[in-house]
Amino acid sequence: MEEPFLLRDELLVPSQVTWHTNPLTVELKRVSRLAAPMATVTIAQYLLPVISVMVAGHNGELQLSGVALANSFTNVTGFSIMCGLVGALETLCGQAYGAKQYEKIGTYAYSAIASNIPICFLISILWLYIEKILISLGQDPEISRIAGSYAFWLIPALFGQAIVIPLSRFLLTQGLVIPLLFTAVTTLLFHVLVCWTLVFLFGLGCNGPAMATSVSFWFYAVILSCYVRFSSSCEKTRGFVSRDFVSSIKQFFQYGIPSAAMICLEWWLFEILILCSGLLPNPKLETSVLSICLTIETLHYVISAGVAAAVSTRVSNNLGAGNPQVARVSVLAGLCLWIVESAFFSILLFTCRNIIGYAFSNSKEVLDYVADLTPLLCLSFILDGFTAVLNGVARGSGWQHIGAWNNTVSYYLVGAPVGIYLAFSRELNGKGLWCGVVVGSTVQATILAIVTASINWKEQAEKARKRIVSTENRLA
């Protein structure tokens, strides 16, 4: 039974190939149909906390500093972990769907939620002491107090996210991106309304946006849960197999922990970058400029993340279905989208290099500095888009551990030391720090390219078969 399964795409009878029937063209259309909605979804999800910070900032400079600090701390210690762990579902749910093991998909998603909740309790304990932690690290007591209060009201949002992200991956791996699109955009609009109501109508100050974020995440969780429960599209996959629950949790952590390491190591690097900028000769200027560059970079990255999610889904589905060569074509299709997307946004950014800074500041010094760093930012766009796609391949294939080790070597053994050396020893300041990021991304991209090019896709399909179809928890 296994041989036809593994060689399904090799048994297809060749026919005359035209542009419309070319495998790459066909797969490019499929990936694009997933990538476009998912890019919108990731942007909407990214804007939830951004809108909260923007609204909180209208309460004053002190409040903005406290909220920004809380947002940074909670991202590093909580939200990044939740986002990372769920990468396991891109492997497990995606390959199960491709293998038509529909009853396993719901079990994997529910096991992820059950695994996330205890972790949220542990993170919440840490968040309760944020004020004391920040003061012990030398932060201003008043800013620390605001950050601690803001983080406290974000705790419910963490639990909401623990439900939202697994359900999102549950739908994504089945190709159900239109419901994801509508729920994400609806939640964003709801969040704007709740933010305005709590801050300006009820006068809850800078805690209002945090409360709004928590309410919005739970609103998001409820509408996603309702869709999963009542939609006919999920009829085959929303079931729960109790006998597989424990083994599903084990598999979730096997792939989730290295997946979380992949995400967290990357997120944490940029927080270290901002901290280092505060030690430079002109800390106010350097921190402001690097924060602007990081914001621009993140806005682009969430678009690349949408493409990566689409590629991950197609790769995992095809490996689970025993179509290794189609999985390989999915990678090529993702890289084609990367070329178009990164070229477009890099050219756009470079063209607007002298005016984009006005979105953040009116200071000529800041504007000139941002324009000076724009070529490096364009290079980051290209590299990060490339690595995002290949990291999506890693998650879809189930080799998150390689991605985790790659990020450790690329960013912390190469990129960070190079950046610190250029910034402080060579006195390149913020430009030196960002050069370190570019060097680290280059190493990361090179390693990922070598690993991806050397993949034996037939072997990956065999591993997917053993990982998903086996009645026991045989880990590939």
Curated annotation (Swiss-Prot):
Entry's Gene Ontology cellular component terms: plasma membrane
Gene Ontology molecular functions: antiporter activity; efflux transmembrane transporter activity; xenobiotic transmembrane transporter activity
Location within or outside the cell: Cell membrane
InterPro entries noted in UniProt: MATE_euk, MATE_fam
Tissues expressing this chain: Ubiquitous. Highest expression in flowers and stems.
Membrane topology note: Multi-pass membrane protein
Keywords from the named record: Cell membrane, Membrane, Transmembrane, Transmembrane helix, Transport
Membrane-spanning ranges: 35-55, 66-86, 117-137, 146-166, 184-204, 208-228, 260-280, 289-309, 331-351, 370-390, 402-422, 433-453
GO biological processes: cadmium ion transport; xenobiotic detoxification by transmembrane export across the plasma membrane
Entry keyword annotation includes Cell membrane: yes
Entry function: Efflux carrier for plant-derived alkaloids, antibiotics, heavy metal and other toxic compounds. Involved in cadmium detoxification. Requires probably a proton-motive force for the efflux.
Family membership noted in the UniProt record: Belongs to the multi antimicrobial extrusion (MATE) (TC 2.A.66.1) family.
Protein name, entry field: Protein DETOXIFICATION 1
Lineage: Eukaryota, Viridiplantae, Streptophyta, Embryophyta, Tracheophyta
Annotated gene: DTX1
